[in-house]
UniProtKB/Swiss-Prot annotation:
PANTHER family the UniProt entry points to: ENOLASE (PTHR11902:SF1)
Major enzyme class: lyase
NCBIfam families: eno
Cofactors (names): Mg(2+)
Pathway(s) this gene product operates in, as recorded in its UniProt entry: Carbohydrate degradation; glycolysis; pyruvate from D-glyceraldehyde 3-phosphate: step 4/5
Keyword Cell membrane attributed: no
Name under which the protein is recorded: Enolase
Assembly and interaction partners: Homodimer.
């Protein structure tokens, strides 16, 4: 009954209106398991290849080549394979036999495309859970060898800037984390209340237009100073109890190693506001001193290992320094970051690396190093895989946008269902969001 009998892919659309790949895996028990691939706006240069068509259709962003690779190469090759054998399907068949492309950071998926491979990997994972007749999150936990399921703390991205919004704010995300909640359900209540209170604060201060939302449902008021964004959050969370702040700077979007940094979104920029990497480091330290910040993601360029290590050494005890573009969910880059003490948390994005198996390995390495893990991707579909992934791997944190826009709420609603299903066994990460479980 676990045998794969049919695989089909198609082109669908993500939350930005860009084409993406969806795959369906049918097993001998007649069940069809479907999965769609997410994408990102600010992508790291070390991510596995996302195969796009080029040309004029969809401004070059079509994925019909990747779809063809599933329908004509991957699909036929996996007929008869056991859907519960996730590692064998990912590594032995799709990577080694079918794609075979490698660079200094491992399997790069340049022949078939990480989006083609990942669509099948995700759908196979869902099929494996179906065959075993267990929830997807439990199947993922079993694949990882994780004995304890944990509901993550949601990091609500409530103010958008950078590549996620049309305002002048350089830093990309300002988030709230309800670590003081006793359950995921209560965390949602806190997040929603802060979100609506923030909307009222922004509307009163900047006008109705300022409550327009960005890519992830967060507000995008036309503010230019990053500190102003933090002040807005400080005001909004004052009445909400134990809620703390996280930031995604996405510094690779406006900064290069050995060059000065400037606000890339400032019109008629004359260079007068450029600062050095050391000055930027000190700016983060001042933010941490002044605001209840517990997480800073991508504080420097993806190649600036030196300043990542400096910042982690100086404030890593009280703040998690999250590697996104730095790590791209790649086990080999995680290994390097552990050795160099460049950060102390992994941003888990399955599409950066292109398979369930490699994602699990990156998480296990991170946990063994004592790191935190946060699951995420911004260019989303209605697929809720990431919700089950965060519970099954006990990441402790999930970042999937504001409590706004249906592709965002689909994940949060799935987490509410999982918590309800677990009943008295449900555990919410809360204040232990950085280390919710022992390494597995």
């Amino acid at each position: 009954m676990a045998e794969i009998t049919h695989i089909k892919a198609r082109q669908i659309f993500d939350s930005r209106g860009n084409p993406t790949v969806e795959a369906e895996v049918t097993t001998a028990n007649g069940v069809v398991s479907r999965a769609a691939v997410p994408s990102g706006a600010s992508t790291g240069v070390y991510e596995a290849l996302e195969l796009r068509d080029g040309g004029s259709d969809y401004l070059g962003k079509g994925v019909l080549k990747a779809v063809d690779n599933v329908n004509k190469i991957i699909g036929p090759a996996l007929i008869g394979k056991d859907a519960t054998e996730q590692t064998a399907i990912d590594i032995d068949f799709m990577f080694q036999q079918l794609d075979g492309t490698v660079n200094e950071w491992g399997w790069c998926k340049q022949k078939l495309g990480a989006n083609a491979i990942l669509a099948v990997s995700l759908a196979v994972c869902k099929a494996g859970a179906s065959v075993k007749k267990i929830p997807l999150y439990k199947h993922i936990a079993n694949l990882a060898g994780n004995p304890k399921l944990v509901l993550p703390v949601p990091a609500f991205n409530v103010i958008n800037g950078g590549s996620h919004a049309g305002n002048k704010l350089a830093m990309q995300e300002f988030m709230i984390l309800p670590v003081g909640a006793s359950s995921f359900k209560e965390a949602m209540k806190m997040g929603v209340e802060v979100y609506h209170h923030l909307k009222a604060v922004i509307k009163k201060k900047y006008g109705q237009d300022a409550t327009n939302v960005g890519d992830e449902g967060g507000f995008a008021p036309n503010i230019q100073e990053n500190k102003e964004g933090l002040e807005l959050l400080k005001t909004a969370i004052a009445k909400a109890g134990y809620v703390v702040i996280g930031m995604d700077v996405a510094a690779s979007e406006f900064y290069e190693k050995d060059k000065d940094i400037t606000n890339f979104k400032e019109e008629n920029n004359d260079g007068s506001q450029k600062i050095s990497a050391d000055q930027l480091k000190d700016l983060y330290k001042s933010f941490v001193d002044e605001y209840p910040i517990v997480s800073i993601e991508d504080p420097f360029d993806q190649d600036d290992w030196e300043h990542y290590s400096k910042l982690t050494a100086e404030i890593g005890e009280k703040v998690q320094i999250v590697g996104d573009d730095l790590l791209v969910t790649n086990p080999k880059r995680v290994e390097k970051a552990i050795k160099e003490k460049a950060c102390n948390a992994l941003l888990l994005k399955v599409n950066q690396i292109g398979s369930v198996t490699e994602s699990i390995e990156a998480v296990k390495m991170s946990k063994r190093a004592g790191w935190g893990v946060m699951a995420h991707r911004s260019g989303e579909t209605e697929d809720t895989f990431i919700a089950d992934l965060s519970v099954g791997l006990a990441t402790g944190q999930i970042k999937t946008g504001a409590p706004c826009r249906s592709e965002r709420l689909a994940k949060y609603n799935q987490l509410l269902r999982i918590e309800e299903e677990l009943g008295s066994e449900a555990v919410y990460a809360g204040a232990n969001f950085r280390t919710p479980v022992e390494p597995y």
